[in-house]
UniProtKB/Swiss-Prot annotation:
This is Serine protease HtrA-like. It comes from Staphylococcus epidermidis (strain ATCC 35984 / DSM 28319 / BCRC 17069 / CCUG 31568 / BM 3577 / RP62A). PROSITE patterns: PDZ. It is found in: Cell membrane. Gene3D superfamilies: 2.30.42.10, Trypsin-like serine proteases. The chain crosses the membrane at residues 224-244. The lineage of its organism: Bacteria, Bacillati, Bacillota, Bacilli, Bacillales. Its EC number is 3.4.21.-.
Length: 585
């Protein structure tokens, strides 16, 4: 075989065989059914067309009959009116006839003869006209001959001829009028047919247009979806940019001071600042916090004027602000300062009361609120003097972040917690110098005194204030006694959580008890001894409140400083549960 020659495969080897025809019974049956259905549809349409034509003809027939009826009614009305006119004319002629009664029989006879002779030519003429004009002229001839035979007077004959002539003329034109009516009805029929034909053509055009629209959407629906998607996207973008513009406008109006809430906050701050003073236990001229001195020797904070008697003002502040100094420097107004005196303080509640004499009438007591009505997330303002008098009257805004917090406090700075402080949590910025400052609600009422904050590198916005109801009760004790006398059960206690297994086994403490305080020693004749408490007892509940540790125990006991009532203690003694009454006075 020659390699240069192209190899060709015979067509008989690779040609595709012709497909055999398969008889599709279902398809032929479907086509036959469709054909029969189309024929039936055509027959129905043809039948409906005939029915419509019959209805049109019937309607035209009815319309024609109705029209003829109306014409007959009008004809009768015209005849009636004409007869009435004829009757009136006859009455008038009768009156004139009475006036002519004086004429003799002779003249009347002459008139009759003359009328007879005059009617003969007319009679001949009417007979001649009978051959030309037919029935209509014959009737007129009979009437004329009858009048001549009766021999009526000339006036009466003329009147009868007048009354007969219009009636004859009306009937003489009735036949052309019917022809005109037929032509009119035929024209109306043709006009209605044209209207129906036009209506059918319009319906056909509408259907064809609908079919074209449907075919267009079927063919181009992907493109239509893309176009609709683009339009929706543009509308969404427009709505987004419109909202952004509205927000920008709102922010602009807020900065312009048009918002009602900001105006209210401004008024509250303006009034409340006058009741907040600076309290400093260092009487030197430098009123700025110094890093070179010990914090306990140079503590600076804020105070709130809550009462004014004469020229003396009473100030709420913190015990850690006044420290151990009895004299305090009180700065108010435009850097005016006086020396105040600490009349009472309580380290357990971190509260102190300072009294000073101020003659300035602008210094007014702040309105007291009710801390029992504080709500979570309630907006508040914090007013104080952070970092000293250089930033006095600072106002920060926030909300109430938490209620009924029990915050452990290290009072003596020995890295051990000494007490639990009852407070509510705020998120407003609190800095050194804000201690003792005011927490006011949206109505400008004092609801708390700033006490402390959590100062850790990974904690922000956690400050605490003493509820004003507790502050007022303790301040009352401090005003009268200079201190708060707390009840003391005179027992030494240890946390159950700090016990090891041997100590738990020694007192037969059940395994389920993992909280409370263990009594180590009981002072003789003390409140605990009188109540029946013994060494080795474990107090797990006091006054219906769960005791977790010694801080909670002290807080529950100290909360009864004002009433000193008898409370119930739930204890475990040698593994057995027992209730004991403790008198706090």
């Amino acid at each position: 075989m020659d390699n240069n020659k192209k190899q060709v495969i015979p067509r008989s080897q690779y040609r595709r065989k012709r497909r055999e025809y398969f008889h599709n019974v279902e398809r032929e049956e479907r086509i036959r059914r469709e054909k029969i259905e189309k024929e039936n549809q055509a027959k129905r349409e043809q039948h409906q067309t005939k029915v419509n034509e019959e209805r049109v003809k019937d309607n035209l027939r009815k319309a024609r009959i109705e029209k003829l009826t109306q014409e007959e009614i009008h004809q009768q009305r015209d005849d009636k009116s004409y007869k009435q006119k004829t009757l009136n004319q006859n009455n008038q002629m009768n009156k004139s006839k009475d006036d002519d009664n004086k004429i003799g029989e002779e003249s009347l006879h002459d008139v009759r003869v003359s009328s007879d002779t005059s009617t003969l030519p007319h009679q001949n003429k009417s007979i001649k006209d009978y051959d030309d004009s037919g029935n209509e002229s014959k009737q007129h001839t009979k009437l004329t001959s009858k009048e001549s035979m009766l021999g009526v007077n000339s006036n009466h004959t003329e009147q009868d001829s007048r009354s007969t002539q219009p009636y004859s003329s009306k009937h003489s034109y009735s036949q052309p009028k019917d022809k005109d009516n037929d032509n009119t009805q035929q024209a109306q029929f043709l006009k209605k047919e044209d209207k129906q034909r036009n209506r059918a053509e319009n319906i056909k055009k509408v259907n064809e247009f609908k079919q074209l629209v449907v075919a267009f959407f079927k063919e181009h629906w992907p493109k239509m979806l893309i176009i609709i998607g683009i339009i929706v996207l543009l509308l969404i973008l427009n709505a987004i940019f419109t909202t952004v513009n509205k927000n920008d406008h709102t922010n602009d109006s807020a900065f312009n001071g048009t918002a009602k809430d900001e105006t209210t906050a401004m008024k509250i701050a303006e009034n409340s600042v006058k009741s907040v003073v600076t309290v400093e236990n260092d009487l030197s001229n430098d009123t700025t916090v110094s890093d070179n001195k010990n914090e306990s020797d140079n503590e600076i904070g804020s105070g709130v004027v809550y009462k004014k008697v004469g020229d003396s003002i009473y100030i709420f502040t913190n015990a850690h602000v006044v420290g151990d100094q009895e004299k305090q420097k009180v700065t108010y107004g435009n850097d005016k300062s006086v020396t105040g005196k600490v009349i009472g303080k309580d380290k357990w509640s971190d509260l102190a009361v300072v009294k000073a004499k101020v003659a300035d009438e602008n210094i007014k007591p702040m309105t007291m609120g009710d801390s029992n009505n504080i709500k979570l997330a309630e907006p508040i303002l914090v007013i104080g003097n952070p970092l000293g008098t250089d930033f006095k009257g600072s106002v920060s805004q926030g909300i109430v972040s938490g209620l009924n917090r029990h915050v452990p406090v290290d009072i003596d700075k020995n890295d051990n917690y000494d007490a639990l402080m009852k407070a509510f949590q705020i998120d407003a910025p609190v800095n050194p110098g804000n201690s003792g400052g005011a927490v006011v609600d949206r109505d400008g009422r004092l609801i708390g005194i700033v006490s402390l904050k959590i100062d850790m590198h990974n904690v922000e916005g956690m400050a605490f204030a003493i509820p004003i109801n507790d502050v007022r009760k303790i301040a009352k004790e401090l005003e009268h006694k200079g201190k708060v006398n707390y009840p003391n059960t005179e027992i030494k206690i240890k946390n159950v959580g700090d016990l090891d297994d041997s100590e738990r086994n020694a007192i037969n403490l059940p395994a389920k008890v993992n909280h409370g305080v263990l009594i180590g020693e009981v002072k003789e004749n003390g409140l605990g001894d009188k109540a029946g408490l013994k060494k080795g007892d474990v107090i797990v509940e006091l006054d219906g409140k769960k005791i977790e540790d010694n801080l909670r125990y002290r807080q529950v006991i100290y909360s009864h400083y004002d009433d000193q009532k008898t409370i119930t203690a739930k204890i475990y003694r040698n593994g057995a549960e027992k209730n004991i009454k403790i008198k706090l006075k």
